[in-house]
Amino acid sequence: MANFSAELKKQTKYKAFLLTKRIVEEITQNTYLITFEEDFDFLPGQFCMVSVDGAGLTRKPYTLGRLNKMELAISVKIAGKGSEYIVKTNEKLNVLAPLGNPFIPESNNGAVIVAPSCLAEGIHLSERFDIPLIVASKTELNEKFVKKFKMRVFVGNDEYLNLLSELNHSAFDWIFVSGSRVMEELAVKNMPNKVVYVSLNEYMACGIGACKGCAVETVHGIKHVCTDGPVFRGDNIWQVQRHSD
């Protein structure tokens, strides 16, 4: 099992941070990776809630990442006024973090599959555990950005399905998937004999269990993404028919 004991002991309750954007880089169409001047401690799998008061909206959740094991980062896909504000504002961002439960895998022998909107988290996991990073995107990625990091890129739905069928599942103890619900469900159902973890990206307004907006149905009953997740075993979300060898 990956050793997180020292970091878990250092974990403190979430608090508010004011973050200054260092670089805003377009990864693919309408999707950006933002790095920050400041830093704070968090563990893989955790997320933050970003204030968008300037847009008159509630906070928005984003998974946390770190580039080159140093730079705090998030990935943001512009899907409305709130995310557009986060990308374009010149003001410091008010961020509540770290939130959610950390992802502590049973070994370092895994692989990460993410959509561009979750790429900061994907890079962080890949570098942290020294494991393959695979990006599944509907559109081409910024070539200059791709060259900075070790990743394989698959573009289009057909390419993603081919990836799931051709990936050497037996080489890994686990697969981590973060993207859309459809993307995650396809991974779980196309790899029924593999331990697949999914990082659910659900609407939520608070991130601390108060609003109950992120409730999801699991095989163990209703869970809340912010306090029970955001990372779940995929077969706890979608029932799968396992194949015998």
Descriptions of predicted regions:
Residues 2-94:
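Ferredoxin-reductase
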Residues 8, 224-245:
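Short Fe-S-cluster ligation motifs
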Residues 53-54, 98, 219:
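Short, surface-exposed secondary-structure boundary micro-motifs
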Residues 60, 95, 99, 196, ...:
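Glycine-rich, flexible loop/turn motifs
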Residues 85-205:
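FNR/FR-type flavoprotein reductase catalytic core
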Residues 182, 201-230:
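Local cysteine-cluster metal-coordination motifs and their immediate loop/turn environment
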